[in-house]
């Protein structure tokens, strides 16, 4: 299988998000890369499904709760920006203060 660097990056994001989701299901508190991977994968898949930018910005803020992450992580992540491919083109999705 030959993958472009862009495709390799997307695959790595999805693998990291899968690992993070399994850890979260076991009750393990998530670290910075795991949180970013989960939010990024959520946005990429939502764009692929045809959801709107606004809808993804809103749902991205509700994805992870403060008690699911390690101490100090909510203060470290102010924005998550993802360039996602929508049916009508590529758009930048920004999730502000993603951990509530």
UniProtKB/Swiss-Prot annotation:
Q: In which pathway does it act?
A: Nitrogen metabolism; urea degradation; CO(2) and NH(3) from urea (urease route): step 1/1
* Record-linked CDD domains: Urease_gamma
Pfam families assigned to the protein according to its UniProt record, in alphabetical order = Urease_gamma (PF00547)
Q: Name one GO molecular function term.
A: nickel cation binding
The catalysed reaction is:
urea + 2 H2O + H(+) = hydrogencarbonate + 2 NH4(+)
Coiled-coil stretches: none
GO BP terms in the entry: urea catabolic process
Superkingdom of origin: Bacteria
What's the protein here called?
Urease subunit gamma
Give the organism, scientific name: Streptomyces coelicolor (strain ATCC BAA-471 / A3(2) / M145)
């Amino acid at each position: 299988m030959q993958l472009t660097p862009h495709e390799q990056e997307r695959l790595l994001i999805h693998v990291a998000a899968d690992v993070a989701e399994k850890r979260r299901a076991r009750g393990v508190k998530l670290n910075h890369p795991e949180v970013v991977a989960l939010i990024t994968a959520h946005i990429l898949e939502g764009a692929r499904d045809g959801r709107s930018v606004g809808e993804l910005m809103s749902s991205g803020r509700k994805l992870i709760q403060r008690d699911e992450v390690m101490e100090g992580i909510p203060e470290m992540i102010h924005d998550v920006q993802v360039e996602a491919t929508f049916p009508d083109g590529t758009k930048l999705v920004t999730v502000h203060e993603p951990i509530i």
